[in-house]
Swiss-Prot record:
Known role: FAD-linked oxidoreductase; part of the gene cluster that mediates the biosynthesis of the indole diterpenes nodulisporic acids (NA). Nodulisporic acid A (NAA) and its chemically modified derivatives are of particular significance because of their highly potent insecticidal activity against blood-feeding arthropods and lack of observable adverse effects on mammals, in particular the tremogenicity associated with the paspaline-derived IDTs is not observed.
MF GO annotations: FAD binding; oxidoreductase activity
Organism, as annotated: Hypoxylon pulicicidum
Record domain FAD-binding PCMH-type: where: 35-206
This protein's UniProt keywords: FAD, Flavoprotein, Oxidoreductase
InterPro entries: FAD-bd_PCMH, FAD-bd_PCMH-like_sf, FAD-bd_PCMH_sub2, FAD-linked_Oxidoreductase, Oxid_FAD_bind_N
Pathway: Secondary metabolite biosynthesis
Enzyme class: oxidoreductase
Protein name per its UniProtKB record: FAD-linked oxidoreductase nodO
Known EC number: 1.1.1.-
Transmembrane regions listed in the UniProt entry: none
Cofactor section: FAD
């Protein structure tokens, strides 16, 4: 590893051709479909002083800054051409305050590691649906994670954070101190104008029993399945996470639907009661029916690696739909007309018997229906084809779209709104105040 004039700064400089160490560090991301962008240098920070030095180096060189936590973002925003890339993989901190049930975690902390750490204390935090998602990008983008229908968005659990500004100053942010940055940290995503070095997060009591009901139908059952679920959500326990995937049935080469209903509780009896409305009333005609199966997050994360392996090529787009639309009619094509054998459509309903009111934070787009399309493939020659069919499908939904999830924003291919109008103005104002040169921000709102 090449070292700068400061012996304490672990830095890899771009060379021509790039060194193997540089290229391995540049491409430490989940998505095999990566932009041909080359950071000016990559800093493998393992302490705060490295991060501060990297920020000051960027200012000296008039370079932008990219920050990588887990590298799971499918948009690969951290591969920013000509930037100083600060990779936080080796910058690790994880501690717990027993008195206030609060965890302190570095942005590089992976979801699976946080769950394991908290389980020993009989506590829980709603991390992402993949175990190797780092907290940094996940929380800044809002945190649509485990049972968001019941737990809400993960960013709502942020009680404070330590940050480094674009000038290299270390500050704390919470409801009373630098409250504008605290507001922005909960949903501004890549437009957050500082670098998070520590999150302070409230935790929940761990519900120790986790069971799942799983059913697979042919896509011809789409109308019956989705109408049944829409009606069911009004009375279904908030401790039940509903997820429906549209996919191509293996060997049959026809579209299918799979429902995962995952429930959490204190006992098997308690969980069975929560799943009973699904077990007893699900529509007939299934290819596969599993009424009450034990599951856990490590198993789920391992199974997820089979469907979404690291290094495959990905493209995704995710939106919230307007209240009052005919959801079943609007999304039928998404789930029944998948164009590629590994493609996935996804519905995560947020509806409960009481409408949730979001706290005052940057994350301001919310509705009962969150839907997503995902392309998974291996051949680089398919890039444009895979991107186009998803963008075209999402454009066809635009009359029904309330807003786009900031983590899957495509401001060039499909411009959208990622916050409410008022929240977007605040994101811009806070960004200009704390990062007037757009050294850190500016990926989505490039003209702000």
């Amino acid at each position: 590893m090449e070292v700068s004039s400061s012996e304490t700064l672990p830095i890899l400089w771009r060379t021509s051709p790039p060194s193997n160490d540089y290229e391995n560090a540049r491409c430490r991301v989940f998505n095999g479909r990566q932009p041909e962008h080359f950071p000016l240098a990559i800093v493998k920070a393992n302490k705060v002083e490295h991060i501060v030095a990297a920020v000051k180096l960027a200012a000296e060189l008039d370079a932008c800054i990219a920050v990588r936590s887990g590298g799971h973002s499918l948009s690969c925003w951290t591969i920013r051409h000509g930037a100083i890339l600060i990779d936080l993989e080796d910058y690790q901190h994880l501690s717990y305050d027993d008195e206030i049930h609060e965890v302190q975690a570095s942005p590089s902390t992976l979801g699976a590691d946080l769950l394991t750490f908290l389980a020993k204390k009989k506590r829980f935090f709603p991390v992402g649906h993949s175990g190797d998602i780092g907290l940094g990008g996940y929380l800044l983008q809002g945190g649509i994670g485990l049972n968001s229908r019941g737990y809400g968005y993960a960013c709502e659990y942020i009680t404070g954070l330590d940050i480094i500004t674009a000038d290299g100053e270390i500050k704390h942010c919470d409801k009373t101190e630098n409250s504008d940055l605290y507001w922005a940290a909960r949903g501004a995503g890549p437009e957050f104008p500082a670098i998070v070095i520590r999150f302070f997060l409230k935790t929940c009591p761990l519900l120790p029993v986790c069971k799942r009901s799983r059913y697979v139908w042919p896509a011809a059952m789409y109308g019956k399945v989705f109408k049944w679920l829409e009606e069911l959500l009004n009375s279904l326990s908030e401790d039940v996470e509903i997820a429906v995937f549209g996919f191509v049935l293996p060997r049959l080469n026809q579209p299918g639907l799979v429902l995962h209903a995952t429930a959490f509780g204190d006992s098997s009896e308690n969980v069975r009661e929560k799943l009973t409305p699904i077990i007893k009333n699900h529509p007939p005609g299934t290819f596969l029916a599993e009424d009450f199966v034990s599951t856990n997050f490590p198993e789920d994360y391992d199974l997820g690696k089979d469907t979404m392996p690291r290094g495959a090529r990905y493209f995704t787009d995710s939106v919230f739909l307007k209240p009052g639309i005919d959801f079943v009619a609007t999304c039928k094509g998404m789930f029944t007309e998948l164009k590629h054998p590994r493609a996935l459509a996804y519905w995560q309903p947020m509806k409960t018997n009481i409408d949730r009111i979001l706290p005052d934070m940057a994350m301001s787009i919310h509705s009962h229906h969150y839907v997503s399309l995902l392309a998974i493939y291996e051949d680089p020659s398919e890039d444009q084809q895979q991107i186009s069919w998803i963008i075209d499908r999402m454009k066809s939904l635009e009359p029904a779209i309330l807003g786009t999830f900031i983590g899957d924003a495509h401001p060039v291919e499909r411009p959208s709104n990622y916050w409410s109008e008022e929240a977007e103005e605040r994101v811009i104002t806070i960004g200009r105040k704390w990062d007037p040169s757009s050294r850190i921000r500016g990926i989505v709102l490039s003209d702000a």
